[in-house]
Each structure stands twice: as C-alpha cells, then as structure tokens.
Amino acid sequence: MDGKTYKLRASCNACNESKVRCSQTKPTCARCERNKTTCVYGLSRRTHKDAPPISLSHSHSHSHSGSQPHSHSGSRRSSVHIPNATATANATTTANYTSTTTPFMPLHENSMTSYPPQPSVDQFFAQQQPHHQQPSTAGPGPGILSPANLDLPSFMTPLPTPNEDHTNSLFSSFGNFAAGVGGVNGSVNNILTPLTGSPGTGTSASTSTDMFQQPQVQECTCHAGVMEQMASMSQPSRNEERRLSLDVQLSQLKRCIIASEASMGCGHHGNGDSEPINIISVAMLIGRIIDEFELMLNERIGRGTTMPERERSLSLDEATISIREPRLCWGVLELEDDDEVELRQRLYLLYFRKLERLLSQLNVFVRTLHDSRGGSCNPTFIMACEYIHLWLEKKAEGVKRLFPAADEYTGRIPS
C-alpha cells in the first residue's frame, strides 16, 4: 500500500483461510468472498490493531473501516496508542475468546485438585512469558495472561506443604487425642508415663501405685503347688517299666502332701462371697497320692499278702533292691537285706500316716466350710465336698489293708 511489506496472517479467524493478505481496503479473504461470508478478522492485528471486535455488526465494521481509509498510515503510526473504548472492547473480546481456547484455565482447576506448590506455577509462567511479550495475533496487546495480570491467590488456595511445623501440629493433635482418651479411661497416662511424681504428668506416684496395688493384693500362690504336683504325676509313671525308684516316689508324695496342706491353710479366700474351688483340686491331688501308695504296695508287697507268705514278698523286695534302687545306710552301719526291707515298709507306713493326717485336715476344712459359710456358700458345693472326703477316706482304708501287720513291733510309728 505505502511501499512497505506487511506480514501475512497465519489464517482467517472465520474460515481458516491460509495467508490472508493484510489490506485496509479489502478486509475479506478469498474463501469468504466465494462463500459470501463476512470476514471481519481478515486483517492482521499486528498492523491493524484497531480492527473492529467480533461482537460488532458487519455494517459497523465497514463504516468503521471506511471512515479511516485516508488515515491508514496515521493509525499505523499511532497504533501503539489505542483509544480507551477500543482497547476495552478488544480486551473483552480477547478474554471471551481465550476463555474457551486458552490452556491456562485448567491450570487453576488442576491446582485445586492436585495442589501444586507455588514455585511450579511461577516456573510455568516464566516459561510462557516470552510468548506473551511478543505481539499476539489472537488478542490485543501483550501480557494479557501474564502472572502480573492474573490474581492467582484470589482463586487458588493450595494446602500447606507438610513441613516441620505442620508435622509438629499433627503430632500435637494426636497427643491431645490420646490425652482425651486417657481422660475417659483414667489409666492411659499412668500406663504410658513412668510412675513418678514429676509435675505435668497429671498423676502422682502414690496414685499410680494405688492403681496397680489392687491386682497385687488378690494374687495368691498358695494353690500353685497343687496344680504343679498334679502335672508332675503323669500317667506314664504307672507303667511298671517306667516306675520311679523308692526315694523319688517318696519325695514326690512328700511334696504333694506339703502342697495340699499349704492350699488348705491359705487365708486368701476373699470375703466369703464365693466357694473355695481350690478344695476340689486338693481332693483330686489326695486321690492321686492314694493311687500312688496303692501302686507301690501292689508292686513291692503284693495284693492280698498274708503273714505266712511274707518270706516270698521279702525275696521279691530283695531282688528289686539289688537291681533298681539305692541301698539304705546309716553312716558306717551296714544294713542287711531283710533289715532294709523292714525299713522300707516302715517308710511306706510313715508317709501313709502323713496322708491320713492330710485327710483329717480336709475333714476339718469341710466342716469349717459348712459351719462358717453355710449362709453364703452354695449347699450343693458343701455337700459335694463332704461326699468327696468320704470317698477318699474309704479309698485310703482299702489301701491300708494292703500293709502287713507293721505295727506288731510297736503300736505306733513315732512322728
């Protein structure tokens, strides 16, 4: 037009016609002319920055473009200074157009969902800033979508980055929650905190000690020996091939008697509101003791042994002594075999007398239970204890008949 070469647009905004020539007198591309379509944006906005917006009608655009045919050079020279009304309209048009095509709108939507940190947003705009600094062909003026014009903090509120303060606040919140649970249970702080009287713990050493004192008062080990002895008297010992020697058997019977006496003499029976179930375990252990005596007597003396057959039982005991069991001795005194057999039989009788005394203690315990706890204790339980004691006495009397007349020398065995 005035001897200068103008750059060509990439395409027409109305029909995507390539290489639309910038012409002040002919602002229509060839395709729009063939299709008889209004081509308002045929002019390049690099040299025709005051072109009418798309919202204006075609008549207004022609009148606006026709009113300035002779002042094209002046408008081109003063294209930097755009009137306020036209600049406002162009900014509105550009904002409406970029609302559907600009890639920056999904940016704040993604930020609301994935919460990117602020430095990544600045880095993204720093990469896009050279494109905005150049004259744009899709909007009026540079820097419309620059970070300076976009008020990102107004519509983007990212979550705080997990730093040290955030972590401390998180654990402090958890501590408050644990403190609240401790207030409900009343013992969490005492369990998690050492039992000291330091300030700030909320408890004192005496309070914590009182809390754990109650289970210690109720603990009782008087009945543990009964259960231990019942477990030690295993069934395989009844086999003759695996029978224990005399000293081991008598030691085991002695421990059982001591454990039963300790259980019946226990004073931790409570306030009388429950039955002493331990007496059933004691009765079971006494029954096992009687069975052991019966096995020993049947093995060494023989069932139904009478006085004329005593010599035969002594010979059997001599063979047993020489094979399996240790010999009895008293210092430098050497015992004969028959003397040793007599001493062994008296040891049997001695421990059996201890068993009889244990049965007498059981009888006293049951009578005391009947007299002192008759009102609070279950009568059925008391009756069961009485029947168990009666059965044990009858069983012990049957075992006592297996002994030979050991009291023919002395009327009683000294205790």
UniProtKB/Swiss-Prot annotation:
Protein name: Transcriptional regulator fogI
SMART domains in alphabetical order: GAL4
Compartments it resides in: Nucleus
UniProt keyword Oxidoreductase, yes or no: no
An annotated GO cellular component: nucleus
GO MF terms, alphabetically ordered: DNA binding; DNA-binding transcription factor activity, RNA polymerase II-specific; zinc ion binding
Top-level division of the source organism's lineage: Eukaryota
Primary location class: nucleus
Gene3D superfamilies on file: Zn(2)-C6 fungal-type DNA-binding domain (4.10.240.10)
InterPro entries xref list: OAF3, Zn2-C6_fun-type_DNA-bd_sf, Zn2Cys6_DnaBD
Keyword annotations of the record: DNA-binding, Nucleus, Transcription, Transcription regulation, Zinc
CDD domains: GAL4 (cd00067)
DNA-binding segment(s): 12-39
UniProt gene name: fogI
Region (Disordered) location: 50-153
Biased composition (Low complexity): 80-102, 123-135
S-adenosyl-L-methionine is among the record's keywords: no
Phenotype of gene-disrupted mutants: Leads to complete abolishment of the production of flavoglaucin and its congeners.
PANTHER family: MONODICTYPHENONE CLUSTER TRANSCRIPTION FACTOR-RELATED, OLEATE-ACTIVATED TRANSCRIPTION FACTOR 1-RELATED
